[in-house]
Amino acid sequence: MSVSAFNRRWAAVILEALTRHGVQHICIAPGSRSTPLTLAAAENRAFIHHTHFDERGLGHLALGLAKASRQPVAVIVTSGTATANLYPALIEAGLTGEKLILLTADRPPELIDCGANQAIRQPGMFASHPSQTISLPRPSQDIPARWLVSTIDQALGALHAGGVHINCPFAEPLYGDMDETGVEWQQQLGNWWQSDKPWLRQALQLESEKQRDWFFWRQKRGVVVAGRMSAAEGKKVAEWAQTLGWPLIGDVLSQTGQPLQCADLWLGNGKAVSELAQAQIVVQLGSSLTGKRILQWQATCEPDEYWLVDNLPGRLDPAQHRGRRLLASVERWLELHPAEKRQPWATVIPELSRQAWQAAVASNEPFGEAQLAQRIRRYLPEQGQLFVGNSLVVRLIDALAQLPAGYPVYSNRGASGIDGLIATAAGVQRASARPTLAIVGDLSALYDLNSLALLRQASAPLVLIVVNNNGGQIFSMLPTPQDERRQFYLMPQDVDFSHAAAMFGLAYHRPDDWQSLDEALAGAWRRAGATVIELAVNETDGTQTLQQLLAQVSRL
């Protein structure tokens, strides 16, 4: 009997089972203990293979692939800290709903807790963050193949959102020629190998039913809050709110077109808050709101009813409103709750929004990050998509820009970390094959510098704009101690990214005015690969511009 051959037969069943649950993309890091999984994946023609040498970046690449494809994505890594490096991406997926399947190779039980190399306690290492955890036994022909495949089916069939951790111990030898070992064991599955269906099929029904009193509430004064959703859902929400005559407060990730622009500015005006207080019902579609003023208003509003609709389970409401938590996709919920044509009831807010937008446009001439955010619509590629980093840049775009309705926008706004942003953007581009504009800050770029290697395989033009304000300038907007701010919060690095781009063979530009940025982007959209554009801006102008606009709009 060949141990290495049976390891591969066992792994082949696992990988084939994944294909029955819609897995097409599989991300693989180098490793020896993961050899059975890697070779089984390589031999399975149903997969699109992605490789990366850095497991943390690999996890975020998978996250981006899952975001854009809206399908589960598998990841294969070896044992030890390689597995631990998947933690940030797993956490993000759990909060934003992408489906990740983590196949972590492991040492067999007799090599754990005895000083063996690269052997750590992997079962349960991700605590409560995976939706499900499976600790498989060492491959054995004493275990029926139908047990293995049904175990995988049970986990994936019940997966609504988030990650599944499947820990896979393998004993040595890991290498060797294939022989007949395990062929009869695999044949226990009969014609399953020729089918395209899971061995064990489950019906997952979690959606809320139609609200029977909707016909009553849709005649009231309402407000629509739009959080994270798909581009198609964003367009439908905008039309739905317009038909109802309800003001729509659209987050940057809502893709609604933000008909009431600059909400994070005008929500700082007392007149707007007073008018919103007249609302009898607030319907929030999608979670993960970005703007500070939006979150402050959302936390203090007290309508008669507060409904929160999202496909993810859980409360998703840090303000803990009294109302209804409705588990459904936004698209399905809109189908069940049609709008009734009514005249708009809010009259003050549209005018405040118009004036806030005019103020933002009037401030967009200097070359800076706030101005880039306000102008961002003109830089979007046709038939493309936008990936927005975290920290200051996403807040500036949320507050100052108006994005086209239905234009795809992606970001990691679950845990809102600055790790893995370049890798996530790379995954989003690969899954969609669309031209992609990605914008991150300098510290975010440094944090994920390894992932510039992933941009070399861009299948369409990809532009990474690095806004270099020399540190974490978001902390300039917080009441951080003045004396300690620069050393302990901002942490300026005084770097430029020309050498990083050159190291990975990427085109690079460093424009210093709007005309040179226009020229750099025009050239980048004409070339097939990736381009890094570094915008070196004044350290504090971005935060100061936002604060000045907030003060100006609050006085309108």
Curated annotation (Swiss-Prot):
The protein's role, per its UniProt record: Catalyzes the thiamine diphosphate-dependent decarboxylation of 2-oxoglutarate and the subsequent addition of the resulting succinic semialdehyde-thiamine pyrophosphate anion to isochorismate to yield 2-succinyl-5-enolpyruvyl-6-hydroxy-3-cyclohexene-1-carboxylate (SEPHCHC).
Family, similarity comment: Belongs to the TPP enzyme family. MenD subfamily.
Reactions catalysed: isochorismate + 2-oxoglutarate + H(+) = 5-enolpyruvoyl-6-hydroxy-2-succinyl-cyclohex-3-ene-1-carboxylate + CO2
Top EC group: transferase
Cofactor note: Binds 1 thiamine pyrophosphate per subunit.
Domain of life from the UniProt record: Bacteria
Entry EC no(s): 2.2.1.9
The protein's name: 2-succinyl-5-enolpyruvyl-6-hydroxy-3-cyclohexene-1-carboxylate synthase
Alphabetical list of PANTHER family matching this protein: 2-SUCCINYL-5-ENOLPYRUVYL-6-HYDROXY-3-CYCLOHEXENE-1-CARBOXYLATE SYNTHASE, PROTEIN PHYLLO, CHLOROPLASTIC
Pathway of action: Quinol/quinone metabolism; 1,4-dihydroxy-2-naphthoate biosynthesis; 1,4-dihydroxy-2-naphthoate from chorismate: step 2/7; Quinol/quinone metabolism; menaquinone biosynthesis
Subunit structure: Homodimer.
